């Protein structure tokens, strides 16, 4: 009797333990999204980033790095491409001279206005939803936060609303404060800067380093704010996500695992670091976190609160369906579908959540 009761309790514990751990969501590639050809026979360059609005419209940042020979009768797509949930083009817009050649990230606010980060410039810009009006610019045109104001100057990380190679942006829904990951590449700034909705500098902080990892170049490559008051930053070169509170107090590291891609397959392990960009699942608790792991060329699915890796998917580097070539942007819509934008692959792929 005692042994039977012990076995029963053991079985109940196992069942409880299995249920206590989050089960990873499953996805299937949507072969019919987006609609091809896109727009008026458009050809895109590298897709530097993407974002999704509350109506599940997808905005692609087209870097237009296309040579005339690539066009072959096609037309160069505009810098900003808006797609509806069916994968059809709603509109395209954007002045490449204003946005620059390295548009890198975007964020859509609740009213539909869209923030765009031009990594090669010293500013970020806010546009009306249709792109017809630039509503705000933070940072002075032609000026960098450097010792001499130029691209060649030494980075300052100064207490002002000016940037030097900004990488990503997100907005606090409660306060309207703008969080900028400022420092996409070596030679630029390396900080998280917080700006008021009026464009006034509020505070900043660096990526967290200890004596053991002080030699790793701090490059904040992405930034996303969670519903529970935390700030998630891609510490790209250190292969991890760093988590802070809204005031910049360090909370913890979430390290990424990866299987290096060999040089023969066109990718040197550690060349850029694995933590590139992330997104959260659409539930209020944001149970899952999706991270582009650029070293393994996979999408990592993690349990957000614990940082535990649940699964990864992707069929390795390549240009076939379900493969990725330098994935650089990720988004999740209200239904839980995943979107992966590729810089060298020059496309976006959609993965539907399997019920």
Where are these regions (language model features)?
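Eukaryotic scaffold repeat domains enriched in small/polar residues
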Residues: 23-355
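Bacterial N-terminal signal peptides that target proteins for export
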Residues: 1-10
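Intrinsically disordered, low-complexity regions enriched for glutamine and histidine
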Residues: 3, 21-22
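N-terminal signal peptide c-region/cleavage motif recognized by signal peptidases
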Residues: 17-19
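CBM-like carbohydrate-recognition segments
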Residues: 11-14, 325-326
């Amino acid at each position: 009797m005692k042994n039977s009761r012990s076995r029963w309790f053991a079985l109940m514990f196992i069942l409880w333990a299995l249920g206590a751990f989050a089960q990873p969501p499953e996805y299937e590639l949507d072969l019919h999204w987006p609609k091809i050809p896109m727009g008026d026979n458009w050809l895109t360059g590298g897709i530097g980033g993407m974002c999704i609005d509350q109506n599940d419209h997808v905005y692609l940042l087209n870097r237009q790095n296309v040579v005339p020979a690539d066009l072959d009768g096609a037309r160069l797509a505009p810098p900003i491409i808006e797609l509806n949930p069916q994968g059809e083009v709603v509109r395209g817009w954007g002045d490449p001279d204003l946005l620059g050649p390295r548009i890198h990230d975007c964020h859509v606010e609740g009213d539909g206005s869209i923030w765009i980060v031009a990594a090669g410039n010293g500013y970020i810009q806010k546009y009306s939803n249709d792109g017809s009006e630039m509503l705000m610019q933070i940072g002075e045109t032609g000026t960098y936060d450097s010792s001499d104001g130029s691209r060649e100057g030494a980075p300052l990380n100064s207490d002002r609303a000016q940037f030097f190679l900004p990488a990503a942006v997100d907005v606090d829904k409660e306060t309207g404060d703008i969080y900028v990951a400022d420092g996409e590449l070596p030679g630029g700034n390396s900080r998280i800067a917080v700006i008021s909705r009026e464009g006034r500098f509020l505070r900043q902080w660096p990526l967290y380093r200890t004596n053991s990892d002080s030699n790793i170049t701090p490059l904040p490559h992405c930034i996303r704010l969670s519903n529970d008051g935390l700030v998630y930053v891609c510490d790209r070169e250190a292969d991890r996500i760093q988590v802070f509170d809204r005031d910049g107090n360090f909370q913890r590291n979430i390290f990424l695992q990866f299987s290096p891609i060999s040089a023969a397959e066109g990718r040197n392990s550690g060349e850029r670091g694995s933590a590139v960009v992330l997104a959260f699942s659409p539930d209020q608790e944001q149970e899952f976190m999706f991270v582009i792991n650029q070293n393994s060329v996979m999408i990592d699915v993690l349990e957000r609160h614990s940082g535990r890796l649940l699964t990864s998917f992707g069929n390795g580097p390549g240009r076939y369906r379900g493969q990725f070539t330098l994935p650089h942007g990720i988004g999740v819509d209200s239904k839980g579908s995943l979107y992966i934008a590729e810089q060298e692959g020059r496309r976006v792929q959609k993965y539907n959540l399997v019920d």
